[in-house]
């Protein structure tokens, strides 16, 4: 979702709540995946925070670590602000110098902090490794998995 109006974001949160209510009756969970623009101010407020603070706790906040950092936010700080809402996280690398090009472990995201908190306090159930670039994606995913295995046995 994207809008440059605060009221639109609040209406979007209302729509997420309505969908979550309907789908929860069927045993289906609803969530929102973050984009870079979700972490950039709209009328002085951060859209990700508007969504988080105006949705039912059963709405999953699926943080994308790379998009979060690209948008100017600290993925670790964003995760810890909304404990219990990040049942799944997209582990996407991002470097301020090289953008989305580096593999996980060659970027600027504090992976040890992100993983440790997510596993222990965050109640994260799924970690999805994602690579944004077309440049050698298989090689980048292999490097990313190797690095993640140095932090945690998979």
Predicted regions and their residues:
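Histidine-acidic metal/acid-base catalytic patches
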Residues: 42-60, 67-154
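Active-site acidic/histidine proton-transfer and metal-coordination neighborhood
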Residues: 1-60
């Amino acid at each position: 979702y994207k809008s440059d109006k605060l009221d639109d974001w609040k209406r979007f949160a209302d729509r997420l709540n309505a969908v979550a209510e309907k789908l929860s009756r069927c045993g289906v969970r609803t969530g929102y995946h973050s984009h870079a623009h979700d972490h950039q101010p709209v009328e002085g407020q951060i859209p990700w925070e508007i969504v988080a603070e105006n949705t039912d706790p059963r709405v999953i906040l699926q943080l994308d670590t790379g998009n979060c950092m690209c948008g100017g936010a600290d993925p670790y700080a964003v995760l810890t602000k909304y404990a219990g809402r990040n049942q799944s996280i997209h582990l996407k690398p991002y470097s301020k110098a090289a953008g989305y090009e580096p593999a996980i472990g060659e970027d600027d995201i504090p992976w040890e902090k992100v993983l440790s908190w997510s596993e222990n306090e965050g109640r994260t159930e799924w970690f999805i490794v994602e690579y944004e670039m077309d440049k050698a994606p298989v090689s980048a995913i292999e490097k990313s998995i190797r690095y993640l295995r140095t932090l945690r046995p998979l």
